[in-house]
Amino acid sequence: MRTLFVGDLHAKADLLPLISRAAQRENTDRMVLLGDVCDDWNVSNNGLIRFFETFTSWYRREAGEREVIPLLGNHDVPYFLKQGSSSYARVRALAPGFKPGAHRKVHELMQNIPFQLAWSDGNILATHAGLTRAWGRRRLGTDYMDMPVEEVTDRLNRMLLHPASLVVPMTDIGPARGGAGTPSPLWCDRGEFAEDGDMHLTQVVGHTPVPTVLHEHDAWFCDTFSTMSDGSPIGDGSLLMLSEGGFYSVPLLG
């Protein structure tokens, strides 16, 4: 089984056909999208709606070719929650780049896509930002490090069942991202992961922009599509492949 990990898209529709071609070129069986599908520096309400309509069509086409697992990032959660709920109100206040005028349509489209908080193949854990030991002990139980990775994944995904539960990882923000709490798998910064990442697991994450796919602290960092506010790229657009032979970086343009 060949699994391709794709970093934060941030409403860049031009990336989608390039990712499809890379997946085809690499004979990909499964694709994991590492979250932050939504929002970008200068995207408008209408621009985000148009992007998400394009993304939805692209997702359906890709899901017809291979298994596709879309994960939620911190930028996606406000659109995932229903407008008018107390959970939505709490999350919206913490959402950088949120486009309220796009919420209704994007929320509607998201209901037809099976988003998750975490994914595992039984050996590795993929989340948007990474699982730290402190957050795991606090939110999953003091004995969570004794759990199989599938159970850790299941407990994280159960947070999607109730809006109030999803608020928990969305409001657990560490100092590196402007909070004062224990960083969650939606918010953990690369520096925070270096200090307390759960390294008894092999993790794959996005969230922190990197110049190229990086391996450090037994984790793979894959946010290579993000840009500066003027649109200049931070990363090289590389992707991560997991094959029977292990992990390796894949160029976006082959």
Region locations from a protein language model:
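Beta-strand-turn-beta hairpins that frame and shape the catalytic cleft
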Residues: 1-4, 119-125, 216-218
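Core catalytic region of metal-dependent phosphoesterases/phosphodiesterases
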Residues: 6, 11-100
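Active-site neighborhood of phospho(di)ester-bond hydrolases with catalytic His/Asp-centered motifs
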Residues: 6-7, 31-35, 70-74, 126-127, ...
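Active-site environment of divalent metal-dependent phosphoester hydrolases
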Residues: 10-14, 39-42, 75-82, 132-134, ...
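A structural motif corresponding to the C-terminal end of an alpha-helix
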Residues: 58-68, 101-122, 201
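Active-site-proximal loop/helix segment associated with metal-binding centers of metalloenzymes
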Residues: 93-101, 115-195
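Conserved beta-sheet core of the metallophosphoesterase superfamily
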Residues: 186-250
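Acidic, low-complexity terminal tails and accessory targeting/binding regions
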Residues: 253-254
